[in-house]
């Protein structure tokens, strides 16, 4: 079956001298992996630089449902980046988001709302001109909504401790260790009220920001089985020191 779809690059693994295994989140079919042969010369469309993290591409291929690795017929750039490749901060964020999405969408089928959210977020990051130190935090929070486990912050009126397992506030300290103290809980409420346009208004120290990311990653681990340690988090910790 011939498929034409837009797709977002999540991960690229070198396979031999002239091939790549590329994981995409596609608009029409969700997660798919491709075996891509890249030319050794400058000729040909399948250039290695097309498959950088979060690149938004147009794909054409013959879909084989029983195959773990699809093969591209044609590829082109849908949304050219104007700033992400040239900004160390944006590049670091894009690497973090690509790794996050690679784990978080492993079993996702076609999900138009999720795809649109990711694509719009990538475009916003590329064009952003103000402070972006909180971008990945806002992205992670909003992504949890699309994945179906967004915390219930409305319960904050009835408790001081945020329960990471149940995703809501509790009046008393939970019987397990996966909960936030009062200070972290109130900070979480403030963060959940932010969007990309207002995130610059909320200032945090390096320690506070890293703590927020650690908390949200712990929440992801509790709600997404097999969610691993994020290697790219260390890069962000250094960038926004």
What are these regions (language model features)?
Residues 1-241:
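Non-catalytic alpha-helical scaffolds and adjoining flexible linkers that form interface surfaces
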């Amino acid at each position: 079956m011939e498929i034409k779809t837009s797709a977002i690059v999540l991960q690229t693994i070198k396979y031999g001298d002239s091939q790549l295994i590329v994981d995409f989140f596609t608009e029409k079919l969700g997660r798919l992996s491709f075996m891509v042969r890249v030319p050794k010369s400058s000729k040909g469309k399948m250039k290695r630089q097309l498959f950088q993290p979060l690149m938004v591409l147009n794909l054409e291929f013959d879909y084989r449902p029983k195959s773990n690795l699809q093969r591209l017929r044609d590829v082109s750039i849908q949304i050219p980046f104007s700033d992400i490749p040239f900004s160390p901060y944006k590049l670091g964020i894009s690497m973090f988001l690509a790794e996050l999405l690679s784990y978080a969408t492993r079993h996702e089928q076609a999900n138009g709302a999720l795809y649109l959210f990711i694509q719009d977020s990538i475009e916003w990051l590329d064009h952003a001109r103000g402070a972006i130190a909180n971008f990945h935090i806002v992205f992670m929070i909003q992504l949890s909504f699309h994945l179906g486990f967004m915390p219930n912050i409305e319960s904050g009126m009835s408790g001081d401790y945020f329960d990471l397992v149940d995703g809501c506030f509790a009046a008393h300290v939970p019987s397990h260790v996966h909960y936030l103290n009062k200070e972290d809980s109130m900070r979480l409420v403030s963060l959940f009220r932010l969007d990309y346009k207002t995130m610059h208004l909320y200032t945090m120290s390096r320690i506070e920001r890293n703590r927020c990311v650690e908390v949200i990653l712990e929440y992801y681990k509790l709600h997404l089985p097999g969610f691993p340690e994020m290697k790219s988090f260390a890069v962000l910790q250094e960038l926004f020191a």
